[in-house]
Design a protein with these regions (language model features):
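Short, Lys/Arg-enriched N-terminal segments with co-localized hydrophobic residues
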Residues: 15-26
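Glycine-rich phosphate- or other oxyanion-binding loops that anchor nucleotides, phosphorylated ligands
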Residues: 56, 60-286
Length: 286
C-alpha cells in the first residue's frame, strides 16, 4: 500500500524478473486510469491476474504480455481524477480499504476512455491519442503527453490497420452538450474534450512519470445529448440519483447516449487489445 511518496527503489523482484540470454529484463509497470468501471472494463477483460507463483499478490494488479498493469478507476470529473491520481502516484496516503499497489514507481501512465469530438472531421468511434491536453483556465499551461509512448501507441495501431489520430485535447469541468458549447471549446485549438485527462497528466508530470492518453470519440458536435450537467454535483462528479432523473425525463436521448458509448468502447477495446501487451511503455527504461 502506498503511504506518502513513491518509493525510489526500482529493484527487480517477483514476476518483473526475466532472463534473456544472460540479460535481466524488467516488466513495464503501467497505471491505467479510467473514469468509470465501464471505461475500465476492457482492461480487465484483456489482461490476466497475478501469475501463479507470485509470492506477493496485489489487489488490482494485472498482466498483459510483458507489462504489469494496475487499473485505477477514478470517477467522473476533474476533482475526483486529481484526487485519485495523487493517491495512486503516492502524493497522498491510500485509505485503508483501498487497493494496495506495487512498491515501485510506475514506468508510465495511460489514460483511457471516452471523449467528445469538437471537430466535424472526427467521426464517432475514431481512436485518438493526445499530443497535449489543455485546461479550461487560461492561467494554466498545457500538459504534454510523452512523445515516445504516444508514437509507439500510434505506430502499433497503424501497423494493424487501425486509424488513430493525434489530437490536442481539453479537459472541462462540465459536459459539452450543445453544438455551441463544443464549438466554443474548439476555439482553444482542441479537437476533443474530456473531464479528467488534464489533472491526471499534471500529477504524473509532478511524479516524473511518462504519460499518454488514448480515447475514443463517443459523440460529435452534431450529436443530440441529454443534459447530464444537471446530474453533476458541486465537485463535478456524477450524482446517480440526479442521473436517473435525467434518464427518466430524456429517455430516448439517454438510450442513444448509452448505446453510442457502448459502441465507442468496443472500438477502444480493440485498440487496447493491441496496446496493452505491447512494448509501448519502456521510455523510462532507456
Amino acid at each position: 500500500m502506498v503511504q506518502g511518496g513513491i518509493p525510489g527503489d526500482r529493484a527487480l523482484t517477483g514476476e518483473s524478473r526475466e532472463s534473456v540470454e544472460g540479460l535481466v529484463l524488467r516488466m513495464s509497470l503501467v497505471y491505467i486510469f479510467a473514469a468509470s468501471k465501464m471505461e475500465g472494463q476492457p482492461v480487465e477483460q484483456i489482461a490476466v491476474g497475478n501469475p501463479e507463483g507470485d509470492s506477493t499478490p496485489r489487489l488490482g494488479t494485472l498482466r498483459s504480455g510483458d507489462n504489469e498493469l494496475v487499473l485505477v478507476v477514478g470517477g467522473w470529473g476533474h476533482k475526483k481524477a486529481a484526487a485519485k491520481a495523487r493517491e495512486a502516484l503516492g502524493f497522498t496516503p491510500f485509505p485503508s480499504e483501498s487497493q494496495s499497489l506495487p512498491g515501485r514507481k510506475p514506468d508510465a501512465v495511460l489514460i483511457i476512455g471516452l471523449c467528445g469530438g469538437l471537430s466535424s472531421s472526427l467521426p464517432q468511434n475514431r481512436i485518438v491519442a493526445y499530443t497535449d491536453c489543455l485546461p479550461i483556465e487560461s492561467n494554466k499551461p498545457p500538459q504534454p503527453c510523452s512523445v515516445t509512448v504516444t508514437n509507439k501507441v500510434v505506430e502499433i495501431l497503424y501497423s494493424h490497420g487501425m486509424t488513430c489520430e493525434r489530437v490536442v485535447g481539453i479537459t472541462s469541468p462540465r459536459i459539452a452538450i450543445r453544438r455551441d458549447d463544443k464549438l466554443a471549446l474548439a476555439k482553444s485549438g482542441a479537437k476533443v474534450v474530456d473531464m479528467e485527462s488534464y489533472e491526471i497528466l499534471a500529477v504524473a508530470a509532478q511524479a516524473g512519470v511518462s504519460a499518454a492518453v488514448l480515447r475514443v470519440v463517443a459523440d460529435t458536435p452534431d450529436s443530440i445529448m441529454p443534459d447530464l450537467n444537471r446530474a453533476l454535483n458541486q465537485d463535478g462528479a456524477l450524482d446517480d440519483r440526479k442521473a436517473l432523473w435525467v434518464a427518466l425525463t430524456s429517455p430516448i436521448r439517454m438510450a442513444r447516449l448509452l448505446s453510442g458509448n457502448k459502441r465507442a468502447m468496443s472500438h477502444l477495446a480493440k485498440a487496447l487489445e493491441l496496446i496493452l501487451p505491447a512494448d509501448c511503455f519502456t521510455e523510462a527504461h532507456n
